[in-house]
Amino acid sequence: MGFWHRIRGHVTSWAFLVPFLAFALFPFYWAIITSFKADANLYDLRRNPFWFAKTDAVTHQPYHKDIIVPASYPAAPIHWEIKQGDHTTRSDSEANPKPIARIGDQVVYSPVDGTLSQIEVPEGSTARPVDVIGTIEVENPTVTHYKFLASTPFYRWMQVSLLTGLAVVILTVLIAVPAAYALARLKFHGNRVIGIAIFLTYLIPPTILFIPFSQFVGALHVDNTIWSLILSYPTFTIPFCTWLLMGFFRSVPKEIEERALLDGATRMQMLRLVVIPVVLPGILTAAIFAFTLSFQEYVYGLTFISSTANRTLPVGISVEMVRGDVYFWGPLMASAVLGSLPVVIVYGLSLDYFISGMTTGAVK
Amino acid sequence: MAEVNLENVEKRFGETWAVAGIDLTVHDQEFVILVGPSGCGKTTTLRMIAGLEDVSAGDIRIGGRSVVNLPPRDRDIAMVFQSYALYPHMDVYRNMAFSLQLRRVPKKEIDRRVNEVAEILGLTPQLKRKPRQLSGGQRQRVAVGAALCRQSGVLLFDEPLSNLDAKLRVHMRTELKRLHQKVRSTMVYVTHDQVEAMTMGDRIVIMNGGKIMQVATPLEAYDKPKNRFVAGFIGTPPMNFFSGEWVDSKVQLGGGVKLPYPRSSPNGTKSVVFGIRPEHIYVRPSGNKGETAVPSVIEVVEPLGHDVVATASCGAGVFQLAAEIHDGLKPQDKLDLQFDMARAYLFDRDTECVL
């Protein structure tokens, strides 16, 4: 008896939970630390996927970043100088960074507002474009990758994805809620068959459907617009949400519908005042699933949209942030982290609804 | 005036008959109980009155107006469901006010009625609670309260007490009876519990197999059952039955047991079922006329307190009798039990009707 006896239940449940948590959360951990790692740390293979490091795994030197003469600078040898006092100053604000070196009349700024270590270029030496003219100690962890996103259409893609998601959710709820109620409650010929058929349509993968769909998209003249997505995403969100909602509607005690009818409600009033409020957690769940499904959709987004500005987030990231076989891991992971935020926020806000059983107390 | 008339009402589900043609009149302000075993059609009958089931044939009139083609909301009825059917997202006040709000009753009037009903049912402190925060008994009272607020002519109850524990059920039984005397609505109450039926109803309707077996006051149902089903259904412990032959004013049961049967009965020989209630079998002679001693052996004794239910056997078979604990019955006792023939019944073995 005593300590072990008391915590045995906890030990058992944690023993089951920990492997699951490790499995489920590890990708997020990796994405998050990658998005904040300086490139030097990121490409230091022995330091991956571990926590931020201060020094190189091989040389045990602090991570440095080379300062390179901009490629845009004229190719001819140039005279450049560093003014005394410039090379050790730290930029105090982003708005007014202090120059750290001058090449001719051009000024090379600190690429990040981190600590500046040394610029060891003798006075009067010449440097060509892409020459290393100094090194800078890198900031680790760093928000460089996130800042870089501002120079890409990332926020535009986010906007497209959010807008599409919202429109798809509205469309899905408007169509799936009445459909699910009819299939779950009303007795009509063939409602079982229709219910199963609706679910089967969800099982057909988009990779098969995108070619016929592109014909529709072309015929409607909505290709390369957000409308092509708003109209095609419901083809998988509606069946899924209808199926999901049927279960919720079935769990509504029939007696409270009957009581509403006896209390003087018409069928529409009964739906609006009794059934819908009771299945609200279910509708919210369906809305979240519809949002998540459309937010992460890839195939239609890739095929129906051709201009960079109209891309959705997943397509934009993978198309624009991978050049050939070069993966910009930092910005990629930064956009993955930012991209998962809307879903995390939506889930977080509605967690209480998932957990609380709204129907408790309805019957018995 | 809210008299409920059922005329040859039938209900079929496909090939099966749930209700096989019943006629019934429930008078204004009467408390009528539909009672019977499960599947006897009592709930279906109630739901047809409510309009939740269509009638397959026949007519239902409420207050003289045929309602078979009216939706439930136009029938001037309120109903209390077995599972209470409270709206889980509304507090107690809104649960009770909902039907009035739908009917656009003025806010002041709603407030007055809800508060009055809440006062009667002792729900005033709970008005702001959600159903899930209430106990089973409180939920039950909210369901009754919501029905009462309507002040409809007819109140329907579908086994409203069956989800309560035994003690609360007895208490609510009294409460509902008191309530009926107060609100004077016509009440139709469905239950499978014959004790509930006997204690609460002005009249009880005993149903079996989709048919009405008897409509009677509790006393009539107990004293003058029309048939073997009613005789066996009403009363606890249930009536004892022995099959036998009726020959020359005597009932011959198995094992050579012969009982005189004083009432006028058909002549000649007839196959009958002899029925006698446990409480009409006495341990010692009371001196009443018409008692017949039957040699028996006590097998099991079940004391309930003051009363004892004993199981005994005689030549004709096993039966139960009600005795008092001070009678001192013990298993294996051999004694002559007195059958009160004046209160025994004979049923036709084929038609099961009382003779």
Predicted features along the sequence, with ranges:
Chain A
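A structural signal for multi-pass alpha-helical bundles of membrane permease subunits
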Residues: 2-93, 98-364
